[in-house]
Amino acid sequence: MKDLLNLLKNQGQVEEFDAIRIGLASPEMIRSWSFGEVKKPETINYRTFKPERDGLFCAKIFGPVKDYECLCGKYKRLKHRGVICEKCGVEVALAKVRRERMAHIELASPVAHIWFLKSLPSRIGLLMDMTLRDIERVLYFESYVVIDPGMTTLEKGQLLNDEQYFEALEEFGDDFDARMGAEAVRELLHAIDLEHEIGRLREEIPQTNSETKIKKLSKRLKLMEAFQGSGNLPEWMVLTVLPVLPPDLRPLVPLDGGRFATSDLNDLYRRVINRNNRLKRLLDLSAPDIIVRNEKRMLQEAVDALLDNGRRGRAITGSNKRPLKSLADMIKGKQGRFRQNLLGKRVDYSGRSVITVGPTLRLHQCGLPKKMALELFKPFIFGKLEMRGLATTIKAAKKMVERELPEVWDVLAEVIREHPVLLNRAPTLHRLGIQAFEPVLIEGKAIQLHPLVCAAYNADFDGDQMAVHVPLTLEAQLEARALMMSTNNILSPANGEPIIVPSQDVVLGLYYMTREAINAKGEGRVFADLQEVDRVFRAGEAALHAKVKVRIHETVNDRDGGSVKNTRIVDTTVGRALLFQVVPAGLSYDVVNQPMKKKAISKLINQCYRVVGLKETVIFADQLMYTGFAYSTISGVSIGVNDFVIPDEKARIIDAATEEVKEIESQYASGLVTQGEKYNKVIDLWSKANDEVSKAMMSNLSKERVIDRHGVEVDQESFNSMYMMADSGARGSAAQIRQLAGMRGLMAKPDGSIIETPITANFREGLSVLQYFISTHGARKGLADTALKTANSGYLTRRLVDVAQDLVVTEVDCGTEHGLLMTPHIEGGDVVEPLGERVLGRVIARDVFKPGTEEIIVPAGTLVDEKWVEFIELNSIDEVIVRSPISCETRYGICAKCYGRDLARGHQVNIGEAVGVIAAQSIGEPGTQLTMRTFHIGGAASRTSAADSVQVKNGGTVRLHNLKHVERVDGHLVAVSRSGELAIADDFGRERERYKLPYGAVISVKEGDKVDAGSIVAKWDPHTHPIVTEMKGTVTYVGMEEGITIKRQTDELTGMTNIEVLDAKDRPAAGKDIRPAVKMVGLDGKDLLLPGTDVPAQYFLPANALVGVADGAQIAIGDVIARIPQETSKTRDITGGLPRVADLFEARRPKEASILAEVSGTIAFGKETKGKRRLVITPNDGSDPYEELIPKWRHLNVFEGEQVNRGEVISDGPSDPHDILRLLGVSALAKYIVNEIQDVYRLQGVKINDKHIETILRQMLRKVEIAESGDSSFIKGDQMELTHVLVENERLGADDKFVSKFTRVLLGITKASLSTESFISAASFQETTRVLTEAAVTGKRDYLRGLKENVVVGRLIPAGTGLAYHSERKRRREMDKPTRVSASEVEAALTEALNSSGN
């Protein structure tokens, strides 16, 4: 028997599984799970509190209430294990079997499962090809349905009401079978022949022409194939047996006072059992049909409520009027099983307390209160005490600890040594929200935190609390030390910059220390070395800010790992020389020879990390902190009312502004300007005045007059406390100082519009009642916004994590040659992000050549580090193709080469890194810093006049990019394409700026010309759209009849006459269909052809076009024939901040999106239909023309006869990402989305690496739509996983069959999360019911590839150290295959053992 137990014990480890399958349960399967039938609705006896027999808590079915004790108490020991008591029928076993044993209820009449009925699209409806309304009428006993028409005229599946049924009975007698209720539905489902139906549908689909019908049929076909493939039978969607949940999962808990708290499920089960028993009785009595029917309907409703309360009709409510929680409610939502218990668990060995500053700690330490440590490390202390022989038993050790004897503290100190603990601060927005530290025991009750890690935790000391967790196992301690230690997390995973940077006091101290003052004590002295400076300063012979000369010895490391020693004399200050003492060897003196503001310090730490490595940097960071604290204390910087110096010019500026406003008011009163103009002008005026005041104030604050050594008065940078705080970046900003010492400025109303009268006072002067009242709006809005923002930002992060959670680095190189083309990011002519920054940490996809030669300077496959970046900049390369997560060809996961550098470590990413989650956290974490509001253009916000020329900022060489142009007689070029760009390159060939050139721009320079800074190189009229000729010839008017299609008008000011084309709706009847045009003819009177085509050169004129040339006039190349006035585009609200990011990631189609050309070809306009214009594009390759109807109000940028390329903008508007993907491909989409998202973050000063956005994009592009199915089993129009399709195509290609063709599809992150391969991950995200219903019907398998699924089933995640565990597990299983015991062998062993034990 012992062997048998061992055998079972070994088989009990269910960890060894690779997939989880979900399906429909057949009645037989439900019975096989069951340990008995629940026949009575009773729960427990009210006197004895023992479970009733055959009731919902029956001990005979579910097992004993107490461990190893039957209900009547006859058997009470472990030795009786497995015995079944003959008196009460209870098996003697552990009480916890009541958590796992299920029961069942035999239903007297079948019941449809509400999930498959009502969860849209209704699965039962699809299979039976009936509408949901009809099926409900049958199920809830309103109509009969014909099951077998026999030889009658009725049809199968036809609905009959009572009257029709009785008529049919009279007419046909028993020749047909029609029933109602779930049994009828079950019969119909049972009768479906899947094979036959699938064959019929596969034939029918290709013969159908209507799109909607094809959609409907292919939906049905998919469902049928799913049923056929999964082995589920359709009739299982109707229940005949109902499983009952184990009682301990729906407990009945006694409260004090003799009352009971019960789970709602018990009420719901009771209802079902009561109705079921009543129905059985009625059937036995053969009661009248109408009563039985009513009871059956009530049973159906009771089961519906149990499975998913409230899905149909009104929810059943309990005694307190709230709806009961059904089985479906148990698993869905934030409080459901998935999110509450499976994904977020509570942890033992943890504690929490308030945090305070630990300025004396080292970076890897934290202060842990003794009381907490004693409690957290209890088991370790017990063990140590016993080992030492200080306590004989655990009990004795416990007593010692409770008494807090002196030995206990010694043991505690020993236990804690080198045992890291994890500190976590909620909300944990990114992985740096949990880090490991070595505990240092402290008195008191607050945890001490190292100041430098505050930035990572986003912590401050105003009452924040943090949690401590103890890693127990050796492996956990190892991971905590090697991966999570605060000293290993110097760089931020979001952008690779240091996150351990000093802030506030430390910055102020270092800044104060490195400032210089004129005529300070000891100015002009020369020192032999740093030690001498130190001695003189300590002796008080030289002031901290004195300008001195010092001889220094420095060791400078170069990039190749070598180092150079040199000695030189530098001009510096005493403070900087003192600071250089803590700088590690290898860095040059120049890094500290400047006022150390926040940015400079950050740069210093970054440089230190790259040059001398991690260990030195950590020591250096600590030294910086200690130094900073020391000197900020010495500086005595504080703040007093006299620091707010109000500028003298303030009154004058405000008076002048008030005068101007009065002037505008009087103009408005006399009707010269409109209300809107007045409002805008006034607001402009005040914002200008405000800027002037703050300028005057800052120049006042930032300078002070002092007398130098020679007795001359000079200006030096001010030592005003407030100015120093703002200037160093320690606290405050110019905007805040402006409110304290300048003027508060314009305020916004609650609706976001700006109030015309500004607050002219500042806080030092004090606000009047009205001014205070106006300013309360803003303050209140700020708080409300913050609360909303936090919730929204959290939800965005959750969606991002969900879509990217299964993306892990799984291999080193996928071997792809594709990538993204990287160019410098240029905005409005300025280079916002140079190429070097964008390619840093990426792998080059294709060889980079020296410009103008064939010489390879960066070979493909190079990981670009700082050294290579300098090299690329030096050689003035302006475009590089780099590997990207989007183009990676790894099947499951991503490869290390396509991802590139692990930003937080600075080397190539390791296999097993969960890059998806890191990307999601990096994008989501700064979400709370983004603004919520949408910016209105108008008022003082961002108002720019339309650009009408290009004025270069830097001198250099002109480069023209894909610009089609013609040359005018005077040598100027005229742009005749829309996408042309003009760039200026410096002497090294590096691009410094780039501008877009609109159609019709006159360019006064040529490719390769040298220009000076500030010169204007191109001009155009922003308010009209010209039509430019591309050849010379004679103008001939076509269809231009005065009064019918055109009208002449004379300009009063200039006396010039213009011809204006009339709008079609203003023309008389004769002119409705005439299309006025200007035609070009040669000297011989023949039509000229457009260059390179056989299309006659005639320019059709749209409505309102102004023609500037006379009939028969000679014109030259590049002349303007006509101008189309452009209304200034409507000012759209620019959605900014968080909503914009969410829109982009959700891939929402914008309202009134821009219209792009679907094909490359020539534009023509067809016949107009009501309110719409017909645009026809004739492709150049001679394929069929493409037609599109465009609303008349859309302003088009193109005219007849013009050439467009696929994807070019025809009508302006916000871009639709789906169009970009369809017409321009994946890389154009990537460029668009990355730039758009970066723009939002850049506005807030947040840096995020592009690759994180690309990583999320990869997940959004997982799906494809089948365009042609070829020989595959796919159906046209299906959405499939890209990897599936590629695998299938490879298989077909190998067999020389036709492969399927597909187009890429962009899904929003929510949709992408729900359509993932893993149903566990999707169900735990959103729409749990729908996901599970779909998965069950199709019998889906979840291969547990992602992180989330593995957390839910309770295994290590397949990332990081868990990846190694999983691959090792698989390897071991391959080796151990033969030794595994099959189920049949276990059964044989069991019977044998039982037989032998029986004898």
Swiss-Prot record:
Superkingdom of source: Bacteria
Cofactor info, note text: Binds 1 Mg(2+) ion per subunit.
EC number(s) from the headed UniProt entry: 2.7.7.6
Subunit (UniProt): The RNAP catalytic core consists of 2 alpha, 1 beta, 1 beta' and 1 omega subunit. When a sigma factor is associated with the core the holoenzyme is formed, which can initiate transcription.
Gene: rpoC
One annotated Gene Ontology cellular component of this protein: DNA-directed RNA polymerase complex
InterPro entries for the chain: DNA-dir_RpoC_beta_prime, DNA-dir_RpoC_beta_prime_bact, RNA_pol_asu, RNA_pol_N, RNA_pol_Rpb1_1, RNA_pol_Rpb1_3, RNA_pol_Rpb1_3_sf, RNA_pol_Rpb1_4
Protein name in the entry: DNA-directed RNA polymerase subunit beta'
GO biological process: one example: DNA-templated transcription
Native organism: Pseudomonas syringae pv. tomato (strain ATCC BAA-871 / DC3000)
Family: Belongs to the RNA polymerase beta' chain family.
Cofactor: Mg(2+); Zn(2+)
Function recorded in the entry: DNA-dependent RNA polymerase catalyzes the transcription of DNA into RNA using the four ribonucleoside triphosphates as substrates.
Residues given in the record as Zn(2+) 1 binding sites: 70, 72, 85, 88
Keywords: DNA-directed RNA polymerase, Magnesium, Metal-binding, Nucleotidyltransferase, Transcription, Transferase, Zinc
Annotated positions binding Zn(2+) 2: 814, 888, 895, 898
Binding site for Mg(2+): 460, 462, 464
Gene3D superfamilies, per database record: 1.10.132.30, 1.10.150.390, 1.10.1790.20, 1.10.40.90, 2.40.40.20, 2.40.50.100, RNA polymerase II, clamp domain (4.10.860.120), RNA polymerase Rpb1, domain 3 (1.10.274.100)
Catalytic activity line of the entry: RNA(n) + a ribonucleoside 5'-triphosphate = RNA(n+1) + diphosphate
UniProt-recorded Gene Ontology molecular function terms: DNA binding; DNA-directed RNA polymerase activity; magnesium ion binding; zinc ion binding
